[in-house]
């Protein structure tokens, strides 16, 4: 029986509903609507069960000149439904108005007063300096800032954290304990560090010391030296504020490049190259070429044939005759230089045996023959007096 009822539900249900309405039993719920509508929750069923759709369907089905009891009830219920729809629609208006008001509140710009053109260090230092005792607590600093600047009187309160951080993280502020026995206590005083007065110099509150002050004074003195002094009665023109070393005129550049405007010091390159070297221990006039070290008086040696008898058994080795082309480097202090005679530094010594002597005919060039133990020979030369300092290696030719 149920299969026969639910099979033609789409077409037969409307007809059954119209028959029931014609019979005047609209108050009794139909089994089709009770079972089918609850079990099937489609959109069409929801639209059919809605009050507005039901009233519209009742008007259509009970249209014409036929008015039954159900139709009368529907006509009586129509004002209620319309009133209900109006009552349901009426809350939508206030909600829309509230939503619109919320959007308007969000779109309203947030007004914040302009921040004063000072850093927090400057503001805190200003508050401490204006105090009678030269020290204030954190609450007193906040009260001073709120009373002096409108920015701190608004709803924004994040500046209080900035004040606390700047007090505790900068060395220019010193905390003075109210009770030394309770260093962890609050309401301590804050005052300016007397050792950090440079931070508040020239009316400018700086976070740290300026590092370009020395360079600025040196450059200012360098540029000042380039300008020629005027007459005694003529005042010097003051430099303009926009003038800079880069944007100077060509005449200024030529004046700045003159030797008088350059950096004058004993360590300047021009000063070092222009002045000859003078020994501090000796005030005698310097020669044409000066040595950067002290040279010991060493008489010029003759050629090697005169030195041969000094050797025992002819045990000598040839040594490269360095410095023969540069007699000025090995010249003695205050002695005249003989460019014709070759100069040698190491004297002869028979402290160590060496290979037999070979004549200059086999060697093909004139050589100075000295012992193989060259440091001993140099030590013997140093025993006579302070020997010259050699700035290069001694080259030896081993046969």
Swiss-Prot record:
Biological process terms in GO annotation: anatomical structure morphogenesis; cell differentiation; hair follicle morphogenesis; negative regulation of transcription by RNA polymerase II; regulation of transcription by RNA polymerase II
GO molecular function: DNA-binding transcription factor activity, RNA polymerase II-specific; DNA-binding transcription repressor activity, RNA polymerase II-specific; RNA polymerase II cis-regulatory region sequence-specific DNA binding; sequence-specific double-stranded DNA binding
Transcription regulation in keyword set: yes
Pfam families: Forkhead
Predominant subcellular localization, coarse grouping: nucleus
Bias (Pro residues) ranges: 228-238
Described function: Plays a role in hair follicle differentiation.
Name of the featured protein: Forkhead box protein Q1
Organism: Rattus norvegicus (Rat)
Organism taxonomic ancestry: Eukaryota, Metazoa, Chordata, Craniata, Vertebrata
